[in-house]
Structure formats: C-alpha cells, structure tokens
C-alpha cells in the first residue's frame, strides 16, 4: 500500500499534493468499506494504546502550540479549546475504547420485508466513502473524527487549524501506528501536512470527486465559508446559541445548578449556554439567586434595565447579544412572558443546536421538547450534555444542526448511508 505524504515544510505544489492525498484516501476507503469488524477493532485497540503510551509526546507538542497562541493574544476560551491535559488525553483514549466496543454499523440490516411476488428487500448500512473534516483549534477532533471514520468504514481527510498543527500531528502519529498494526492503509486517516489555508478551498472542491462529504468544526466564519464554497454535501455544525429557560415550575436549587453548569463548566464548548431566560412568574423569587450564582462564579451577565434593577452588577445588553455565541464566561439574560415568551425568543435567536428547560411541570416540559426546533432539547439537564460521548457514541465528529441525513451528535452510525439488497428467485416484472 502507498503511504500518504508526511508533514511538508517549505514550498509545495499544493493542488498536486491535495489531489494525491484525495486519491489515496479514495483507495483506502475501498479497503475500509469491506474491512471486517475484527480488523478495524484491532486498529482501534492499537490506537488507544498508542495514545496512552505517547501522552507525554502529545502534551509536549500541545505545549508548543499553546505557547505560540498565548503569545498572539488569543482569548481564554480559544486557549482552553486548544489545550490538552493528561485528563483530556485519557478521555481521548477512553473514547477510542468506547468506539471499539460499540456495534459496527457497516452491514447492519435496518429493515427487511418481503414483497407479494416473493422478493425479499433489505435496507443495509454502508459507509459514505471519504469524509473531509475541517476544524479549528480542537486537536482532539483528530482522534474523534479519525476513529469514528474507521469504525464506520470511511476514510477521513483531516485539515486541522494551523494553531493546533503540532498537536494534531502528534495524535495522528498514534492513529497511523494503529492502522499499521492492523495492516490497514495509512491513508485511511490522512492529516493534511501543510498549514496553508488554500488546502481548505481545495478540499471544498471535492478533489476531483475524491471527497464525498465535508464536516466543518469551527466558528461561524469557517462554517459560512464551507457552506458557501463546498461542491460536496456538508454536515453543518453551526454555532451554539443555546438557551436555558427557567420555568415557573422549576425547583430553584436545581435551576441554579443547571444554569451554572450549562454556562461555566466549560464556557468555550459548543454546548455552553449563552442565554438565560426566566419566566416572569418565577422572576420575583428566582431571578436574583440565579444572577448571583452566575456573577459570583466569575460570569459576566448582560441584561436590560429590569435585570439591572434586580442586580446592579448586571451589564447592559445589546441586540446582538441575543444571537452571540460568546465562548467566554458571559451570558445574556432576559425575563420572558412564560413558556410562550421563551419559545418565541428561541425561535428568533436560537441556532437550532441545544435548548433546555428547567421545570417540574411535565406538561410545560413536553410542550417545550415538542415545539423547540433544535437538534438537542433537554428537560432538567445541562446543555453541556450536548456531546457524542455523553450520548454513548464514544465520540462525535460534530453536532449537526441541519435537518438532512444527520442531526445532533454525529457518531459512527450517522457516518453511514444505506443501500437496498434485493433477493429474488427468478422473478421478472410483468
């Protein structure tokens, strides 16, 4: 088998390089599509071991990336997304173990029926082919996307952000080691070996039919560019302008815990809450404690004059705040006229990502879960559960906010399509 090119420094014929990588990925995809589960799992087990054994090397590479980004004056949220720790590397390896253990989606018969003429028809899961993943800052996407692609029988082309270049290479080395040990083509998981941003445009072109789908993981500008320029299908991962609505039927202690976790556990992740909505009927008793728990945890709260009267530490809110994904310890807050008011606000400003209601009123919860148009809706739980690992998928390649093919956490099963197998006994059509 032909190995993909390694890291390239200096001048390079980028279009030729990318086309070569695309062709190699296509060749690898044909092998993976028919690879037995045992062989894929052998590679995954080896990848998990390699991540654990090489944790120090990954941390060293990441430290260089982080130092470079800090020197450039990046935000704390950006640095948090980029930073790897021993715990995060262990979680990465744990995620690979979960993916190893889940059922192989390839070849699964999802439906079977017999026609009156005796023919049997089966709908069977099949890989998509070659998946291009374009991401920013989060080096763990290298492992998540690579192993999910492998489990689902797809080749993956990864183009990480230039800020995480060293970290991604260190993780990718571990994945390639696993592919070698299982005698699978190294091009099954390809990391674009240059920082040149022009590589993104070439991937979006489809590389002469060698890329079947693009998954963007990054900020609003990246996703907008991908959706505007891509000549292949896109699994859109839009910004997470996520809301927590505290209903009149909420338990205050529960609401405080959920709101605090949803915003402050990790403010930079896409599942972080960006807006707090409080039912006017609950505001007199609940609003002050909710604002206080956020502000005293280091969160900046932005609200209107009504909010500022309740707590003078609240900063003024602007119209653009309602549609902003801060990625920082900042939250916009608003009192709404009950469930109807919350639904109207979310419909206007939400990004169809993740929305939560806190209430003991089952009827209100049922209506919220039914009427909110989002990939993930939660009742009495933090928005930070918007994560493939928390859904039992092991990892995710992204949170798809569109409505076609995949929606919500995109795991191994969502990276497959299907075909129909028809079994006959000589039938001809009259």
From Swiss-Prot:
One of its GO terms (biological process) is L-proline biosynthetic process. Its EC number is 1.2.1.41. It catalyses: L-glutamate 5-semialdehyde + phosphate + NADP(+) = L-glutamyl 5-phosphate + NADPH + H(+). InterPro entries: Ald_DH/histidinol_DH (IPR016161), Ald_DH_C (IPR016163), Ald_DH_N (IPR016162), Aldehyde_DH_dom (IPR015590), G-glutamylP_reductase_CS (IPR020593), Glu-5-SA_DH (IPR012134), GPR_dom (IPR000965). One of its GO terms (molecular function) is glutamate-5-semialdehyde dehydrogenase activity. Keywords: Amino-acid biosynthesis, Cytoplasm, NADP, Oxidoreductase, Proline biosynthesis. Pathway: Amino-acid biosynthesis; L-proline biosynthesis; L-glutamate 5-semialdehyde from L-glutamate: step 2/2. Its main location: cytoplasm. It is found in: Cytoplasm. PROSITE patterns: PROA. It holds the Pfam family Aldedh. GO terms for cellular component: cytoplasm. Catalyzes the NADPH-dependent reduction of L-glutamate 5-phosphate into L-glutamate 5-semialdehyde and phosphate. The product spontaneously undergoes cyclization to form 1-pyrroline-5-carboxylate. Belongs to the gamma-glutamyl phosphate reductase family. This is Gamma-glutamyl phosphate reductase.
């Amino acid at each position: 088998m032909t190995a993909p090119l390694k890291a390239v420094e200096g001048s390079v014929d980028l279009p030729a390089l990318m086309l070569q990588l695309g062709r190699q990925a296509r060749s690898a995809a044909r092998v993976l599509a028919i690879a037995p589960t045992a062989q894929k799992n052998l590679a995954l087990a080896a990848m998990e071991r390699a991540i654990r054994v090489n944790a120090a090397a990954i941390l060293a590479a990441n430290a260089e990336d982080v130092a470079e980004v800090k020197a450039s004056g990046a935000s704390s949220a950006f640095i948090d997304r980029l930073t790897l720790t021993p715990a995060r590397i262990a979680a990465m390896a744990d995620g690979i173990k979960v993916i190893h253990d889940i059922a192989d989606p390839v070849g699964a018969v999802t439906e079977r029926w017999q026609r009156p003429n005796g023919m049997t028809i089966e709908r069977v899961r099949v890989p998509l082919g070659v998946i291009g993943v374009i991401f920013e800052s989060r080096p763990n996407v290298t492992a998540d996307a690579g192993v999910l692609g492998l489990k689902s029988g797809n080749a993956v082309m990864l183009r990480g952000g230039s800020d995480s270049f060293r970290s991604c290479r260190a993780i990718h080395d571990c994945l390639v080691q696993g592919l070698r040990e299982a005698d699978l083509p190294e091009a099954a998981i390809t990391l674009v070996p240059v920082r040149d941003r022009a590589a993104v445009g070439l991937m979006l072109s489809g590389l002469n039919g060698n890329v079947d789908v693009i998954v963007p993981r990054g900020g609003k500008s990246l996703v907008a560019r991908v959706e505007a320029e891509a000549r292949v299908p896109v699994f859109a991962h839009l910004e997470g302008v996520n809301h927590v609505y505290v209903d009149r039927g909420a338990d205050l202690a529960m609401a405080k815990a959920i709101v605090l976790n949803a915003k402050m556990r990790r403010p930079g992740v896409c599942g972080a809450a960006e807006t707090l909505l409080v039912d006017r009927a609950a505001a007199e008793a609940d609003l002050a404690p909710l604002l206080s728990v956020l502000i005293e945890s280091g969160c900046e709260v932005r609200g209107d004059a009504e909010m500022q009267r309740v707590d003078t530490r609240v900063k003024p809110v602007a119209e653009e705040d309602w549609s902003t994904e801060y990625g920082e310890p900042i939250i916009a807050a608003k009192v709404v006229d009950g469930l109807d008011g919350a639904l109207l606000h979310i419909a206007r400003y939400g990004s169809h990502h993740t929305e939560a209601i806190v209430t003991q009123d089952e009827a209100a919860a049922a209506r919220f879960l039914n009427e909110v148009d989002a990939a993930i809706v939660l009742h009495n739980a933090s928005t930070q559960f918007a994560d493939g690992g928390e859904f039992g998928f092991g990892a995710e390649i992204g949170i798809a906010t569109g409505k076609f093919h995949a929606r919500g956490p995109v795991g191994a099963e969502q990276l497959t399509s299907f075909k129909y197998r028809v079994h006959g006994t000589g039938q001809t059509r009259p």
